[in-house]
Amino acid sequence: MASTSSLALSQALLTRAISHNGSENCVSIPAFSALKSTSPRTSGTISSRRRNASTISHSLRPLVRAAAVEAIVTSSDSSLVDKSVNTIRFLAIDAVEKAKSGHPGLPMGCAPMSHILYDEVMKYNPKNPYWFNRDRFVLSAGHGCMLQYALLHLAGYDSVREEDLKSFRQWGSKTPGHPENFETPGVEATTGPLGQGIANAVGLALAEKHLAARFNKPDNEIVDHYTYSILGDGCQMEGISNEVCSLAGHWGLGKLIAFYDDNHISIDGDTDIAFTESVDKRFEALGWHVIWVKNGNNGYDEIRAAIREAKAVTDKPTLIKVTTTIGYGSPNKANSYSVHGAALGEKEVEATRNNLGWPYEPFHVPEDVKSHWSRHTPEGAALEADWNAKFAAYEKKYPEEAAELKSIISGELPVGWEKALPTYTPDSPGDATRNLSQQCLNALAKAVPGFLGGSADLASSNMTMLKAFGNFQKATPEERNLRFGVREHGMGAICNGIALHSPGFIPYCATFFVFTDYMRAAMRISALSEAGVIYVMTHDSIGLGEDGPTHQPIEHLSSFRAMPNIMMFRPADGNETAGAYKIAVTKRKTPSVLALSRQKLPQLPGTSIESVEKGGYTISDNSTGNKPDVILIGTGSELEIAAQAAEKLREQGKSVRVVSFVCWELFDEQSDAYKESVLPSDVSARVSIEAGSTFGWGKIVGGKGKSIGIDTFGASAPAGKLYKEFGITIEAMVEAAKSLI
């Protein structure tokens, strides 16, 4: 019997089932502790083009020794396995055909390996997709998403019913054109941009390894699950996959098993036109165990043996190269790029049905297949119930560790965590906001169990080291400093995986703000997939000085303000930095970017942690009746300039309001009344100042206001000289204000 605390933990996890649109009717998930346990082969012909292409291909790339794979005995009836595999194929074919859009080739080729994974290997509870100790699966080749939807449907997930398959790629459906974790319970990560999925999988596997090292005991391995992924040639070509797989090998992520769909076909044709490297040897060099399944089309025992071998290797991740035929079973399109991203067409669908001996109507699941897969509901319930009992015993014996683990699993922050954040007064010493950020990071790491992160080889510049913890490494996975090396893109995507593993994981990652250009795709996926990663971006302007325009961000603030579901903070001092972290920690479905200075800044009068929650607020004002002569608006290092310009104008008898615009997105969320109290509509004299692009400031200052900024690239010179030459000065702001009054 699960403990009361375990029941509460179950209830806390139910919130994960609520879709991003706020509906609570998207999926029905009972509390996991309440679930009770109940207890001749069609080979198909292969296009001769596959054999010819294979011959050409292997003449150009060196043969790779296949790891030994033993024949194993399975209890599954081979004819039923064939039938189940073909069910997966035809659910994908039929859905793509009905939508007149999609990618049937990958599901047709990968159906055997995915069937064995979902039906024979993975542990999960289809009635609670968010059960903590489930195995995770990430379809990195996200265009083949009908493969995963078919699997979820057969496994009994309520999120993918027959009507959902029939509405594939349609408005409002639970089966979008690429996997979306926020739309479809059972989907772990949002994939589609190639390489992002395997990177997320590395993050998920890192999270498991970290939690296992922290919380497992000799008598109770409370954290014990695998991460599986399917990636294709396109994922392999993308640079991000090499970045993250290099780290996975370095970290020894033994519970990460990736299936490489080796079908030799890309959108433009055979991969020989652009991709002839030995993937096997590359992964061996990256520190992976490599297995080659030569017959991925129907070599079920080979696949089973490969998985068994992969699980036996505990000190490194495994790549299982599975040679498949894209569009397997299609007489005229198999092994062709034409089957990659378009419906087969009515005639070819019929020909494929005949070829594979499939007499059923579209979307039909044969009764014996349905009956076979139905066991996953009671088996999944039993798995979760067993784990609940295990957790109850763990909690009784190890209450402190259990409390920390529950916080990470549920996302419930410890009581009073925010009190750990530092506060400042105007008399506190001035400092660069990157240094003030480090104080916040270290305070949060001590107060929040799931807080961890690192930098892309710039920890000493980004100031992101957690002083109370060591480095997460192969031998010390319990530590919380992540060393990503110079791999910005991979870093961001790995952090997405960590954030998506459990609601209480709060990963941060860091580099120079300008190098977000190397990781923008991962940051966009953060926003789309509602992964609350904290991006610590230092050296946020020309204020970094002599390194010059290659390192000086200009358009970056504007670009992130334009990105949906991301908060762009530019704090001016210690209180605003702490306030930004407070919000970033609590907003678990929205990533945050903190743009931080290299140069020292003063602690300003009028700032506060609490005020940051408004996004924009008044820090000083000598006007009456909410009608200042002019409003000066600044962010970050330029808020000090706005404050000093205000003093100059006040000396000349002007009434001036100074507004900190630390986060546009939060200001947009405020009531109209609050916005009017800060930026009264009848005060058109407004001047903004920011050491970056002026793009977008028009909506803040209005048609009659002025924006001071930089709309060219920077230059190499000392910071003070740059500010003067680019006109980011007190004098420029005073003159602009006077011209409007």
Swiss-Prot record:
Disulfide bonds: none
Catalytic reaction(s) noted: D-sedoheptulose 7-phosphate + D-glyceraldehyde 3-phosphate = aldehydo-D-ribose 5-phosphate + D-xylulose 5-phosphate
Positions annotated to bind thiamine diphosphate: H143, G192, P193, L194, G234, N263, H340, E488, F515
SUPFAM superfamilies: Thiamin diphosphate-binding fold (THDP-binding), TK C-terminal domain-like
SMART domains, sorted: Transket_pyr
Modified positions (N-acetylalanine) in chain numbering: A66
Span of chain positions assigned to the transit peptide in the UniProt entry: 1-65
Subcellular localization: Plastid, Chloroplast thylakoid membrane; Plastid, Chloroplast stroma
Record's note on what induces expression: Up-regulated by salt, sorbitol, and abscisic acid (ABA).
Xref: PROSITE patterns: TRANSKETOLASE_1, TRANSKETOLASE_2
Pathway terms, separated by semicolons: Carbohydrate biosynthesis; Calvin cycle
A single BP term in Gene Ontology: reductive pentose-phosphate cycle
Cofactor (UniProt): Mg(2+); Ca(2+); Mn(2+); Co(2+)
Active-site annotation: E488 (proton donor)
Coiled coil: none
InterPro entries assigned to the protein according to its UniProt record, in alphabetical order: THDP-binding, Transketo_C/PFOR_II, Transketolase-like_C_2, Transketolase-like_Pyr-bd, Transketolase_bac-like, Transketolase_BS, Transketolase_CS, Transketolase_fam
Enzymatic class: transferase
Modified residues (Phosphoserine): S428
GO cellular component: chloroplast; chloroplast stroma; chloroplast thylakoid membrane; cytosol; plastid
Binding site for Mg(2+): D233, N263, I265
Cofactor binding comment, as recorded: Binds 1 Mg(2+) ion per subunit. Can also utilize other divalent metal cations, such as Ca(2+), Mn(2+) and Co(2+).
Family: Belongs to the transketolase family.
Protein name per UniProt: Transketolase-2, chloroplastic
Taxonomic source organism: Arabidopsis thaliana
